[in-house]
Regions:
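Conserved SGNH/GDSL esterase-like catalytic core that processes O-acyl groups on lipids
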Residues: 1-51
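Alpha-helical scaffolding within the catalytic cores
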Residues: 11-15, 124-130, 157-161
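C-terminal regions of proteins
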Residues: 157-212
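Loop/turn elements at helix/coil->beta-strand transitions in domains of secreted/extracellular proteins
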Residues: 22-25, 136-142, 170-172
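Active-site-proximal beta-strand/loop segments in catalytic clefts of secreted hydrolases
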Residues: 1-2, 29-31, 144-148, 177-180
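A generic secondary-structure signal
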Residues: 12-19, 129-133, 204, 208
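Acidic-and-aromatic substrate-binding clefts and catalytic sites of carbohydrate-active enzymes
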Residues: 3-7, 118-123, 149-158
Length: 212
């Protein structure tokens, strides 16, 4: 999910591994350790009744939101997460990639846009625990940094520091694709490859053995 912080990702991964057969390989983009996202976390209140881990996380991090869900059941569903779930309920998940090309105007303004990554020890700990749990179940975990628009990666502060911190926290190497795509038409915006770029990204990961 776009903007999903690593603490929410951890409980979702733990629930998945507990309920379903473990995948052979799992890819994690370490930029999910960049920042917390309480607003997005609150949206998962819709599903807290189906996950003790999720319920506990929301209770510990957002106690007022958690109690709001106890006082009013409808409160649980007044959020973007549930609205998106309704929208996508009868649709395939095979078409979620961006189907647009970054506008020429925005592309020429790349030097004006800065993106300071943050380094959160708490979220790095969540990443470490995800990797450790998956590995105990035989999952081959690979860490990556996804591609950024050409020239934008140099505007992302602390990217190398975050990569180093993730490697130290997990003991795994991070494959950095932040500068891997040089074609501007492969992006829908500065941070998201479009369909064309995603195909190129997948090909790169296959060539590198990151994907089987």
């Amino acid at each position: 999910y776009n903007g999903l912080p690593m603490d929410v990702a951890k409980v979702l991964v733990q629930d998945y591994l507990e309920r379903y057969p473990a995948p052979k390989r799992m890819l994690i983009d370490i930029t999910g350790c960049d920042r917390t996202n309480d607003e997005l976390m609150a949206g998962f209140l819709s599903y807290s009744g189906q996950s003790f881990r999720l319920d506990t996380l929301i209770h510990n991090k957002l106690e007022k939101v958690w109690w709001g869900g106890k006082v009013s059941a409808l409160f649980r569903y007044n959020n973007e997460i549930f609205q998106r779930a309704l929208s996508h309920r009868n649709q395939t998940d095979a078409g979620w990639l961006l189907d647009r090309v970054i506008s020429p105007k925005l592309a020429t303004e790349v030097a004006q846009h800065q993106y300071p990554l943050e380094i959160h020890p708490y979220l790095l700990q969540q990443l470490r625990e995800i990797c450790a749990e998956a590995q105990t179940r035989g999952v081959d975990v690979r860490l990556v940094i996804s591609p950024y628009f050409p020239q934008f990666a140099q505007n992302v502060a602390n990217l190398d520091a975050l990569k180093k911190a993730a490697e130290q926290a997990t003991g795994l190497s991070v494959t950095d694709y932040s500068r891997a795509l040089s074609d501007p038409s492969a992006f829908g915006d500065f941070m998201h490859p479009n369909i064309k770029g995603s195909k190129s990204f997948v090909d790169l990961m296959r060539n590198d053995g990151v994907l089987p």
